[in-house]
Amino acid sequence: MAKHLYKTPIPSTRKGTVDRQVKSNPRNKLIHGRHRCGKGRNARGIITARHRGGGHKRLYRKIDFRRNQKDISGRIITIEYDPNRNAYICLIHYGDGEKRYILHPRGAIIGDTIVSGTKVPISMGNALPLTDMPLGTAIHNIEITRGRGGQLARAAGAVAKLIAKEGKLATLRLPSGEVRLVSQNCLATVGQVGNVGVNQKSLGRAGSKCWLGKRPVVRGVVMNPVDHPHGGGEGKAPIGRKKPTTPWGYPALGRRTRKRKKYSDSFILRRRK
């Protein structure tokens, strides 16, 4: 998608970018309200996730992650903005009259045809089991459990690669660098998720960040000692510790957060980077 650069003398919007080719008028039957409870607070109102709060009200778009319209071709009608994710979404009009949203594959344009099922062509946007895909295929929206819907590689620009097949399992290299096993009966969509350059987008001002529900981030080194372990000192002082820590004194970088003895450990051949 082409990005438009604001040309304005106003400092607040200078060098901000916006995509003019993406619409934002969703279908009424494919949206519903969703209460954003807490916004970083727990049931007692205490902040448990920092730098969250506010933001514009959102309507949730019902995305078809299952792709269970078997052997029915559909046509891309619109490419729309979704406030609930970084990736764009496509409105698909199927031959039987059904309309559904899917994640926008990179390079797909209005008028393209997609289909899901077994023995379908290996082309962008088509969904089929891993057993029918050749090695080296770039895929996204990958199921972990058959029929549960895609759960892996769904963010903007995400793409995984099918690198091996042995027995009933397929080996995938995920965007994080993790190499894991998945059943060959699981569905996946061919191609890469669109909106690849979302991390290079310039919002132009702090207010645009607040509309997304993200509050300002303050460095611990500029706080007082009562507020952060990095705080205090005369002038611009270092953190005074061997390693950076969280506001509560725990290691901030490099600490593993995955649970030990998880059921899926046997399917992970190499951990993420």
UniProtKB/Swiss-Prot annotation:
Keywords, comma-separated and alphabetical: Chloroplast, Plastid, Ribonucleoprotein, Ribosomal protein
InterPro entries registered for this protein in UniProt: NA-bd_OB-fold, Rib_uL2_dom2, Ribosomal_uL2, Ribosomal_uL2_bac/org-type, Ribosomal_uL2_C, Ribosomal_uL2_CS, Ribosomal_uL2_dom3, Ribosomal_uL2_RNA-bd_dom
Tagged with keyword Ribosomal protein: yes
Cell inner membrane recorded as keyword: no
Pfam families hit by this protein: Ribosomal_L2, Ribosomal_L2_C
Gene3D superfamilies: 2.30.30.30, Nucleic acid-binding proteins (2.40.50.140), Ribosomal protein L2, domain 3 (4.10.950.10)
Span of the signal peptide: none
Gene Ontology CC annotations of this record: chloroplast; mitochondrial large ribosomal subunit
Family, similarity comment: Belongs to the universal ribosomal protein uL2 family.
UniProt name for this protein: Large ribosomal subunit protein uL2cz/uL2cy
The encoding gene: rpl2-A
